[in-house]
Amino acid sequence: MADHPLYFISCGPGDPDLITVGGLRAIEQSIALLAPKVYEEGFSAYLSGKEVESPFTMDHQTVVDWVDSRLKRGPVAFLLPGDFSTFSPFHSFVEHFFDRAVVIPGVSAHAAAAALLKRSWDIAGVAHTAIITSPRAITRDGRVSLREYGGEGNTLILYMLNLPIGELVTELLHAYTPETPIAILENIACPGERVTLGTLDDIEARLDGRDPFGVGSTSSEPTLALVVVGGALVSGEKPDMWDYRYEKLWKPREMK
């Protein structure tokens, strides 16, 4: 029996145009795939004729058994939201199938968010640090709180939100002023894409009762929402920064 590969394909935010050529090639080779429901529409042209299921309707052992049974017949793939490197819940499956796992990198959700908003997360004189984290990851044992990661000069990028918007804002106000910009991006580059911009002072009102994080949802499918907080959302870089870099960094190299 051939040792068929198990692909873990980082699919970016959900737009097929943002997946790598290697990722598309792996999809074409796979006989069966585990994918979020939202990807079934966006990637429908590549999934036609293939067996597709959502992994979020199964426990860990059921997923393992599902994959094992299909690997006997051919290559199998997971379609991963964003990039495997950042807050991916699929790491335990890579560990389980380690020798057969092929991980294919992709575009992270926060990179796609920066492109959508036409902003960089680090801006000279405004934001010197970009911090990527999740309330689910840092509050599990209660020793570290979200407020410890924010603050002036930091762009805070939040994955896997599990807090009502009111609680999130209250926590962030311990680190930022009420005037601090915030963006909530839902389903980036997927059907239902939506961007809500505001400040910590008014973002809850701008949502008008909507729950972008699915806190009260009964669906097994995860919500694809990202939150970005900080001055980099509204500040551009001044042209003199280019000239500074030219004079101090690039021009001296040309003169050598």
What are these regions (language model features)?
Residues 2-8, 73-76, 85, 89-94, ...:
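A contiguous loop/helix-start segment that scaffolds small-molecule binding in enzyme catalytic cores
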Residues 32-33, 120, 156:
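Short, well-ordered beta-strand core segments
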Residues 51-53, 119-124, 175, 199-202:
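Short, hinge-like loop/turn segments at secondary-structure boundaries
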Residues 58-64, 109-110, 138-140, 190-192:
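A short acidic, often aromatic-flanked loop/helix-cap motif at beta-alpha or helix-coil junctions
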Residues 103, 121-128, 178-182:
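Short, structured loop/turn "capping" segments at alpha-beta junctions
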Residues 114-141:
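Short, glycine-/small-residue-rich phosphate/pyrophosphate-handling segment
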